[in-house]
A protein has these predicted regions:
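Nucleotide-activated sugar donor-binding and catalytic core shared by glycosyltransferases
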Residues: 1-372
Length: 372
């Protein structure tokens, strides 16, 4: 069977499409991985997707994408992000399946909708809960050649293991660099012998690592599934990373500084409006602050799923000193860290009846039965 898989953002590509493509190939299917344009794209999605061992198309401009998709023929489509319009265009009269964490327009046009957790299902009509694909992606990391012993500066280090995640897009990593650098300076002054690690995403070019190495921030290129369980505490930003932390049982701090807002794109008509000189930035801040307010006080996935504070969060005018104090406070209470780990792992397995069958396997099994 020829299966079209469609996605756009970095997190969806690495955390969702990667395990789905892997499982489809195990089932003997031919896979067409179609990348859509995305305001959150890193610019290196195609390079990363080519590692998956399947045919890759896109990302293309809307006109070229429309013409190309109109000519493609597949037996079914799995939509893992992006507008359902594009998935329907590729599927034509074939079944269109969608996996999503929340409601999006056009879901009514899909043959079947899947989601990860019961809480996510509340806003998606008639969705099937199959578990989190991000969890499957972490398991794929464990199949890499490198092992936990190969952790760079952490290989023979018994101090506080704090790991920083700088973001999937280069402009966000540039902002993160100075913030992380200042946080590390404060922690070195306080702790003396401190060796941080910065886990670089697969979408970063190797040339970026030079600056981070020269600043003794110890950038590392390893799968999150390998490194996260080795960290005592992780500092990150809102996004898929917080689900990786949940599945790894990794305590940490999620930062959403106001100073980063201008680097976050706004899609659709709102995005066009925010490009207006001078006024645009204020409008963007207003739009993004409204989005944050709709999250009911939590910006990380574990806290939203549990509807309680599990991971630490700092939102707004965040200073390096604020973050450093939060890190020091967290690491001083080992009992609390153990409790956080337990809560995260409980959330990770919430609603699972059988860990032996992964989310990607359930998805592929469903498609096989529906398309004999």
């Amino acid at each position: 069977m020829r299966v079209g898989v469609m996605c756009n953002a970095p997190g969806e590509l690495w955390g969702w499409a990667r395990p789905v493509v892997h499982e489809l190939k195990k089932h003997g299917h031919e896979v067409l991985l179609w990348l859509l344009e995305c305001p959150y794209a890193s610019g290196r999605e195609r390079d990363v997707a080519l590692r998956f061992g399947c045919r890759v198309a896109g990302p293309y401009n809307p006109v070229y994408a429309f013409n190309s998709l109109s000519k493609e023929k597949v037996d079914c489509v799995i939509q893992l992000g992006g507008d359902v319009f594009w998935g329907k265009l590729l599927a034509k009269k074939s079944p269109l399946y969608c996996y999503t964490y929340g409601f999006k327009s056009g879901l009514g046009k899909c043959h079947t909708v899947f989601t990860a957790y019961e809480k996510m299902k509340l806003e998606i009509k008639n969705a099937f809960v199959i578990g989190d694909l991000v969890k499957d992606a972490l398991k794929l990391d464990l199949g890499q050649e490198k092992h936990p012993e190969e952790l760079g500066v952490w290989s023979n280090y018994s101090g506080n293991r704090v790991m920083f995640l700088p973001g999937s897009r280069e402009n966000i990593r540039s902002k993160s660099f100075y913030l992380i650098q200042e946080i590390v300076k404060i922690l070195i002054q306080e702790w003396g012998n401190f060796k941080p690690v910065v886990l670089f995403p697969p979408f970063a070019d190797d040339s970026e690592l030079t600056l981070w190495n020269e600043s003794n921030l110890n950038p590392l290129r390893l799968g999150a599934g390998i490194v996260m369980p080795q960290a005592d505490y992780i500092v990150t930003q809102p996004g898929t990373n917080t689900l990786e932390m949940m599945h790894s049982g990794s305590a940490g701090l999620v930062l959403a500084p106001t100073s980063f807002l201008k680097e976050i794109p706004v899609s659709g008509i709102g995005g066009l409006i925010t490009r207006i000189p001078l006024l645009g930035l204020k409008l963007k801040e207003y739009v993004l602050r409204r989005k944050l307010s709709r999250l009911k006080g939590y910006v990380s996935w574990p806290n939203r799923l549990g509807n309680t504070s599990i991971l630490d969060e700092l939102v707004g005018d965040v200073s390096p000193g604020d973050a450093a104090r939060k890190i020091t406070e967290a690491l001083s209470d080992k009992g609390k860290l153990a409790l956080i780990k337990s809560k995260l792992l409980d959330l990770s397995t919430q609603g699972e009846h059988s860990e032996s069958v992964s989310a990607s396997e359930k998805l592929c099994n469903f498609i096989d039965k529906s398309n004999p």
